[in-house]
Amino acid sequence: MNSLTYEQVREMLLACTERIMRNEPYLTRADAAIGDGDHGTGMVIGMKAAREVLEKEADGDDIGKLYSDTAKAMETAMGGASGMIFSTMFAGNAKEGAPMQEMSTEDFAARMAEGLRAIQELGHAQPGDKTMVDALYPAVEALKSHVSESFEEMLDAAAKAAYEGMEASKKYVAKFGRAKNLMERAIGHQDAGASSTWLIFQEMADFIRGEKTPDPDPESIGEAKRGAELVSKKIINDPLEVVKE
């Protein structure tokens, strides 16, 4: 399969919203380990907003408009930087233009590459900073490397790369967000944003192949409270020094 129709794209995005909502406990546990613990909830809010648009535009015929409307709804519902970043990733930095009734592998790869560029411009994150970029960057590179192949092969490669990037995030010290206050203590924990990014790419690959890979087990993340408890301790003098009460 080298192109997707409007309806296939719409159904694929709907499947992604379902995957994220179903895995809220997994994402919450990942974020609770070293962050605020609200990533899963925020993603579900965004995905519910996306679903409303995707269901409302069932009779549409412009893929570009579908992406754009979905991104706007997610950003409005989620709010803040996270809303802007994840709506940009989910919709590939959609821009309305000439109506698009079919999407080729080249179109999809270019859209996601532009989304990555916009996210990095917005947040200045690089691979290795323990953010969603750890999964998104290698996924986009895989899309570009396999763009001449079928959607099945291209998305399989992207999902694998996103997973490996998410796993690699465990090795990094966080450069952004609340987790950066943990410094080396964040090592060993995966980034929640990278986890969401992997789930989205995995669901797209599953949808195109007509298969279902198992959802990850929240318990596989390990002790979820350790990082959050460390960050919640009183901080005095040096804002990077966590002082136990």
Specify the residue positions occupied by each region the protein language model found.
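N-terminal loops that bind phosphate or other acidic moieties
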Residues: M1-E245
